[in-house]
């Protein structure tokens, strides 16, 4: 009793037939058709918590090989967003797939707790004048509160983990171990103090890590500035001239940072470029300009001048020639000379081919000037931490650097050194928190040296980290080149920050020499022991005399805190080998984060582990893309295109969100919108309907006594198991490669096409009309029992709530506490499995052809349903052999009342002939058969229904 006009996977259940005296085997299930996920999922969350399911999974996994996914900690501030949800769901799916694969895969979630964003929140709530002790107290309380909010939302997503014992970077033990890690790096020789330009945010009042810098468009004055000749004789000699036609001349530079001009201390040319000495008339007098030869024409045109090149030389010839500061004649404070230093970083793409150098405000400037002998105390650094010029700076003291641009340009014009000013739009560094422009600013900081040769190790940090990248597996593969490029080109790591809420760089520094106390490693351990008991507050309260005794008066407590990227970057030490070493292991098998973490957590973790251990803290890195809206646009509240995970969970259910994550190729951008979620919901319904059919039709099946051995099953049942075995192998292989969207594609296709569109469609007749305990029906039930065992486990990592709901109903007394203590199902071997897969591939092709013909006849009015038809096939070769082998069961595969096959010589003679049946319809199975009414006591039944209800039952061998 089946009809391929019905929806796939849905039994045809007319109420009239149910109530008749010849009922079919219509079983039911408590697994509802409607998921009602938003209502039911929170009940499962509570049940998992009440039953301590995570702990039971750990108990069941004891003794298995471990798989460690180390959680990159989200920051403990604000509600989780859709990106957080993607990240946590991906992690949860991977942990669960490894768990099903026979591993002990614990998941310890974590939080990043120190740093600027929380300090800013405390300032907003309580003002900027709080004592440090109160800042620490309130920051700790605030972070704790935020963690609880985020934790609740993560748990709601179906993420299983050690939520009652997560790691937090602000845990006293972790803070202490971080100080110990700093001590180890100091002893190894990686850590040094120096004056260097670092990323500096005026709003933060602190240095920034590379990962805290983002780029936005900014409009600035682009100016061409002339530095007057101070040594005209040397200029003449460099250009091969006996004498200059005039001593009035300029080396002209181009810059988009006018505020750096007051701090100029040198000029740079490329040693191999050709430079021209150009004679021109300007403001009624003859002047000479030094410009890159290739840029002369464009530059003069920009200035509105005409001129001629009177001599040329290579850049190297100009080395060490000095020029006056443009403001030298205005104020004696600028009465210094700027020498030319050759630099290969100078380009001739635009500007003048000459660069001005302010070593306090540019990395290349700093390196160039230092390499030519400039000492730290000679560096001109007038910009204060708040972005204002120091009061001692002539002409512009007290102004912010941004408001000073205008008066600087005006003064340059006044002294005749401004050759051109235009407003220029360019991509410029901004603070990722404040969205305000930042600068490079030379300050005294603590660094980890990338190219320092440490003690007892034969390679530098850069070399060690680059070698570690080669030993790391990347998903997707392009992440390797990205991380390699960042490590290869990065400057020394600025470890210190000028903040309060952070792990202290707990050094004692000599008041006069600036040297660290000679017992620093020993002192750091003593301080760590105090922090372990009382947190970082212990350092704040510490009186130096307690540790230094009589030396205390000669030393100052260092006020710097560690970069928060050092906090999270050392969790492989503080967590994997520290607070959670019993649960976890080092190195981790996998770190998984968004693509921005190549310069964030992946990066800092690699550097710290390379310094501490000589290798990476992870065996593999997985990167996922960012979430965008349905049109591929970045999400923002102003655009109104933000999708909140909480809203999706509360309306559609977390399983819908999980299915969306799994179905999307995470290696690129992940698009989400109401329309996309609507499609995902439809896909979910098809999967759920399939599960409902499977559960319903095994509800009266007891595997302990009813299970039919595979060798004794009907052929199509053996095929179904062989097909599931092949698919399970493919899906598990995808899971092992962290590939989810192919899994979802296979599961959807399996439920819709393989089951709903073929196997279950054929099976309905046998399930509904065969004898309740007949071999034919038990064979079908045995097959779908095996399929369900496998299917629920395969879908559980993704559709965790739905799989658990179905598992409890399906497995009954054997369900245990949860599906998540199971491993992938060992499907029984099918001896002729490969042959059956080949055979049924052919049969499905034929069935598709027949179905098309049936539809044409139905549309033309010849039949109402496929069971009203009789089919005569002509086939050749393997196709004929496959069809003929089914004997009288062929009609069940084609879902027609009669089917026959005749052999022909070749494919050109093959055909499908559909004719309406002339027989009566059986009121029970709906087949049109010659023997309907042949039994006097049961006039409405066909012979096989009479046999199934009152006799020995029909014989089925194949389908």
UniProtKB/Swiss-Prot annotation:
The domain of life is Bacteria
Record-listed E.C. numbers: 6.1.1.5
Where does this chain mainly localize? cytoplasm
UniProt keyword list: Aminoacyl-tRNA synthetase, ATP-binding, Cytoplasm, Ligase, Metal-binding, Nucleotide-binding, Protein biosynthesis, Zinc
| This protein's GO CC annotations | cytosol
- Amino acids binding ATP: 637
- Subcellular location as annotated: Cytoplasm
Which biological processes are named by the entry's GO terms? isoleucyl-tRNA aminoacylation
Q: Which catalytic reaction applies to this protein?
A: tRNA(Ile) + L-isoleucine + ATP = L-isoleucyl-tRNA(Ile) + AMP + diphosphate
Residues bound to L-isoleucyl-5'-AMP are 593
Question: Which cofactors, by name?
Answer: Zn(2+)
Q: Where is this motif: 'HIGH' region?
A: 74-84
Q: Which residues form a coiled coil?
A: none
The ranges of region (Disordered) come to: 1-33
> A single Pfam family, by name?
tRNA-synt_1
What does the entry's cofactor note say about binding and number?
Binds 1 zinc ion per subunit.
GO terms (molecular function) for this protein are: aminoacyl-tRNA deacylase activity; ATP binding; isoleucine-tRNA ligase activity; tRNA binding; zinc ion binding
Query: Which residues participate in Zn(2+) binding?
Result: 922, 925, 942, 945
Which ranges belong to the motif 'KMSKS' region? 634-638
Free-text comment about domains? IleRS has two distinct active sites: one for aminoacylation and one for editing. The misactivated valine is translocated from the active site to the editing site, which sterically excludes the correctly activated isoleucine. The single editing site contains two valyl binding pockets, one specific for each substrate (Val-AMP or Val-tRNA(Ile)).
The UniProt family comment states: Belongs to the class-I aminoacyl-tRNA synthetase family. IleS type 1 subfamily.
What does it do?
Catalyzes the attachment of isoleucine to tRNA(Ile). As IleRS can inadvertently accommodate and process structurally similar amino acids such as valine, to avoid such errors it has two additional distinct tRNA(Ile)-dependent editing activities. One activity is designated as 'pretransfer' editing and involves the hydrolysis of activated Val-AMP. The other activity is designated 'posttransfer' editing and involves deacylation of mischarged Val-tRNA(Ile).
Note the subunit structure: Monomer.
HAMAP family of this UniProt entry? Ile_tRNA_synth_type1
Q: What is this protein called?
A: Isoleucine--tRNA ligase
């Amino acid at each position: 009793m089946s009809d391929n006009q019905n929806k796939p996977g849905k039994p045809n259940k007319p109420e009239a037939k149910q109530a008749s005296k010849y009922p079919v085997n219509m079983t039911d299930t408590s697994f509802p058709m409607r998921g009602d996920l938003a209502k039911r999922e929170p009940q499962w969350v509570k049940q998992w918590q009440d039953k301590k399911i995570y702990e039971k999974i750990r108990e069941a996994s004891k003794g298995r090989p471990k798989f460690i996914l180390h959680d990159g900690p989200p920051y403990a501030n604000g509600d989780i967003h859709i990106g957080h949800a993607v990240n946590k769901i991906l992690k949860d799916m991977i942990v669960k797939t490894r768990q099903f694969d026979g591993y002990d895969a614990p998941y310890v979630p974590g939080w990043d707790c120190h740093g600027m964003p929380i300090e800013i929140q405390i300032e907003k709530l309580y003002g900027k004048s709080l004592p440090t002790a109160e800042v620490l107290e309130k920051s700790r309380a605030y972070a704790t509160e935020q963690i609880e909010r985020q934790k609740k939302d993560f748990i709601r997503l179906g993420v299983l983990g050690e939520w009652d014992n997560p790691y937090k970077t602000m845990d006293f033990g972790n803070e202490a171990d971080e100080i110990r890690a700093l001590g180890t790096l100091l002893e190894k020789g990686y850590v040094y103090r120096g004056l260097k330009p670092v990323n500096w945010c005026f709003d933060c009042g602190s240095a920034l890590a590379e990962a805290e810098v983002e780029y936005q468009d900014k409009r600035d004055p682009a100016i061409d500035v002339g530095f007057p000749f101070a040594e005209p004789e040397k200029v003449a000699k460099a250009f091969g001239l006996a004498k200059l036609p005039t001593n009035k001349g300029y080396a002209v530079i181009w810059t988009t940072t006018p505020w750096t001009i007051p701090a100029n201390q040198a000029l740079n040319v490329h040693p191999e470029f050709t430079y021209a000495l150009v004679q021109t008339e300007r403001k009624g007098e003859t002047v000479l300009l030094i410009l890159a030869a290739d840029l002369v024409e464009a530059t003069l045109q920009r200035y509105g001048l005409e001129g001629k090149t009177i001599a040329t030389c290579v850049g190297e010839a100009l080395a060490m020639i000095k020029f006056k500061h443009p403001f030298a004649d205005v104020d004696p404070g600028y009465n210094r000379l700027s020498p030319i230093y050759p630099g290969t970083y100078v380009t001739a793409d635009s500007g003048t081919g000459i660069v001005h150098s302010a070593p306090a405000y540019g990395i290349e400037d700093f390196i160039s000037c230092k390499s030519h002998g400039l000492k730290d105390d000679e560096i001109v650094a007038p910009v204060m931490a708040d972005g204002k010029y120091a009061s001692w700076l002539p002409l512009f003291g007290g102004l912010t650097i941004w408001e000073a641009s205008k008066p600087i340009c005006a003064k340059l014009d006044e002294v005749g050194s401004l050759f051109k000013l235009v407003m220029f739009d360019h991509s410029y560094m901004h603070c990722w928190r404040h969205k305000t422009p930042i600068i490079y600013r030379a300050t005294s900081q603590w660094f980890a040296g990338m190219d320092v040769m440490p003690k007892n190790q034969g390679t530098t940090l850069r070399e060690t980290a680059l070698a570690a990248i080669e030993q790391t597996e990347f998903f997707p593969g392009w992440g390797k080149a990205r991380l390699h490029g960042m490590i290869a080109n990065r400057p020394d790591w600025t470890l210190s920050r000028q903040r309060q809420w952070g792990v202290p760089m707990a050094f004692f520094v000599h008041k006069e020499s600036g040297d660290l106390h000679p017992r620093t490693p020993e002192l750091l351990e003593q301080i760590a022991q105090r922090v372990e008991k009382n947190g970082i507050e212990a350092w704040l309260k510490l009186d130096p005399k307690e540790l230094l005794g009589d030396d205390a008066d000669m030393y100052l407590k260092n006020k710097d805190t560690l970069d928060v990227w050092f906090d999270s970057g050392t969790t492989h030490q503080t967590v994997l080998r520290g607070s959670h070493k019993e649960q976890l292991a080092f190195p981790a098998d996998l770190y998984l984060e968004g693509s921005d973490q190549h310069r964030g957590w992946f990066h800092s973790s690699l550097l710290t582990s390379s310094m501490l251990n000589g290798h990476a803290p992870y065996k593999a890195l997985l990167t996922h893309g960012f979430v965008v809206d349905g049109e591929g646009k970045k999400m923002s509240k102003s655009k109104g295109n933000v999708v909140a995970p909480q809203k999706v969970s509360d309306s559609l259910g977390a399983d819908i969100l999980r299915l969306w994550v799994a179905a999307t190729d995470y290696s690129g951008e992940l698009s989400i919108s109401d329309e996309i979620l609507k499609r995902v919901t439809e896909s979910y319904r098809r999967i759920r309907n399939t599960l409902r059919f499977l559960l319903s039709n095994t509800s009266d099946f007891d595997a302990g006594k009813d299970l039919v051995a595979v060798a004794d099953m009907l052929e199509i049942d053996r095929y179904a198991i062989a097909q599931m075995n092949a698919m399970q192998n493919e899906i598990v292989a995808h899971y092992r490669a962290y590939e989810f969207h192919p899994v979802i594609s296979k599961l959807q296709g399996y439920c819709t096409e393989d089951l709903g569109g073929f196997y279950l469609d054929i099976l309905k007749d046998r399930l509904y009309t065969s004898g309740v305990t007949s071999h034919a029906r038990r064979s079908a039930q045995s097959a779908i029992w095996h399929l369900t065992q496998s299917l629920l486990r395969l879908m559980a990592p993704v559709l965790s709530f739905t799989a658990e709901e179905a598992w409890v109903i399906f497995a009954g007394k054997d369900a245990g506490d949860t599906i998540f203590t199971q491993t992938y199902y060992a499907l029984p071997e099918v001896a002729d499995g490969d042959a059956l897969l080949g055979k049924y591939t052919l049969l499905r092709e034929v069935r598709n052809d027949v179905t098309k013909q049936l539809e044409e006849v139905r549309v033309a009015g010849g039949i109402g349903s496929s069971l009203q038809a009789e089919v005569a096939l002509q086939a050749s070769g393997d196709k004929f052999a496959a069809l003929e082998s089914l004997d009288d069961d062929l009609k069940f595969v084609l879902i027609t009342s009669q089917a026959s096959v005749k052999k022909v010589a070749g494919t050109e003679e093959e055909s499908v002939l559909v004719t309406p049946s002339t027989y009566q319809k059986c009121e029970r199975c709906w087949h049109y058969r010659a023997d309907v009414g042949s039994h006097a006591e049961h006039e409405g039944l066909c012979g096989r229904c009479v046999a199934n209800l009152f006799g020995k039952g029909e014989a089925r061998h194949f389908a």
